[in-house]
């Protein structure tokens, strides 16, 4: 299954707000239940609950079905909680790190910068959005002139205290902001409201 490129509002109306996909907020359709519909509401199956959790994770981080399945398999082979390791793997992707630093509004926009070779990790160009960042990695945003004004406005509007503790944003060079990965992210700093155990359960027969 390919990566979703359709209307984003349609997704967040169905799956609720996904900060990585879009910064727009809408009321979920599930919260808009008319009086006549309340009497005919069906009990949601456990499969549907797990499927929704999986879809929230996939769309928020902009993954294909195969990519997410591969991450689940990697998490299963690692020591520790499979669900937490899965979230850690997704959060430490380069495209998500840029998003969490606040230099881009969404993960898709971070992916665009990376694909155009404007991002350096430890002074080397990295053009792979799924690149796994590690503690002590230094990310430099070498944005083109056409994007610098947008970048400066974005950074001004993004409060520095919104940057999670596992990351540090340096603005000593406004035209080339830098990010530092302090340590691996912990569960409390995950930017998405999600029950990762439901995702692991969904893939229990596939991974």
UniProtKB/Swiss-Prot annotation:
Query: Which BP terms from GO are recorded?
Result: ribosomal small subunit biogenesis; translation
Task: Please name the GO terms that the record assigns under molecular function.
Answer: rRNA binding; structural constituent of ribosome
Q: What's the superkingdom here?
A: Eukaryota
Q: Which residues form the S4 RNA-binding domain?
A: 92-155
**Would you tell me the Gene Ontology cellular component terms?**
chloroplast; small ribosomal subunit
Keyword Nucleus present in the record's keywords: the answer is no
One Pfam family for this entry, by name?
Answer: S4
**The entry's keywords:** Chloroplast, Plastid, Ribonucleoprotein, Ribosomal protein, RNA-binding, rRNA-binding
> What compartments host this protein?
Plastid, Chloroplast
UniProt xrefs under SUPFAM superfamilies: Alpha-L RNA-binding motif
Q: Which InterPro entries match?
A: Ribosomal_uS4, Ribosomal_uS4_bac-type, Ribosomal_uS4_CS, Ribosomal_uS4_N, S4_RNA-bd, S4_RNA-bd_sf
Where is it mostly found?
A: plastid
* HAMAP family in the record: Ribosomal_uS4_B
Concerning its family, UniProt says:
Belongs to the universal ribosomal protein uS4 family.
The free-text function statement in the UniProt record for this protein reads: One of the primary rRNA binding proteins, it binds directly to 16S rRNA where it nucleates assembly of the body of the 30S subunit.
Q: How does it assemble?
A: Part of the 30S ribosomal subunit. Contacts protein S5. The interaction surface between S4 and S5 is involved in control of translational fidelity.
> Which protein is depicted?
Small ribosomal subunit protein uS4c
Q: Which organism is it from?
A: Equisetum scirpoides (Dwarf-scouring rush)
Phylogenetic lineage: Eukaryota, Viridiplantae, Streptophyta, Embryophyta, Tracheophyta
């Amino acid at each position: 299954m390919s990566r979703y490129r359709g209307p984003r509002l349609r997704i967040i109306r169905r799956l609720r707000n996904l900060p990585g996909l879009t910064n727009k907020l809408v009321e979920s359709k599930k919260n808009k239940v008319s009086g006549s519909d309340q009497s005919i509401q069906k009990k949601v199956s456990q499969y549907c609950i797990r499927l929704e959790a999986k879809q929230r994770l996939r769309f928020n981080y902009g993954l294909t079905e195969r990519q997410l399945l591969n991450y689940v398999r990697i998490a299963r082979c690692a020591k520790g909680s499979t669900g937490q390791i899965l979230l850690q793997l997704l959060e430490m992707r380069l495209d998500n790190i840029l998003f969490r630093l606040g230099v881009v509004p969404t993960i898709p926009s971070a992916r665009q910068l990376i694909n155009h070779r404007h991002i350096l990790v430890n002074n080397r160009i990295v053009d792979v959005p799924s690149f796994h960042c590690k503690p002590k990695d230094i990310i430099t945003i070498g944005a083109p002139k056409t994007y610098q004004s947008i970048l400066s406005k974005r950074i001004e509007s993004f409060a520095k205290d919104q940057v999670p503790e596992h990351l540090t944003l340096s603005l000593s060079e406004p035209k080339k902001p830098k990010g530092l990965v302090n340590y691996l992210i912990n569960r409390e700093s995950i930017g998405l409201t999600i029950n990762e155990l439901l995702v692991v359960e969904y893939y229990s027969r596939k991974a």
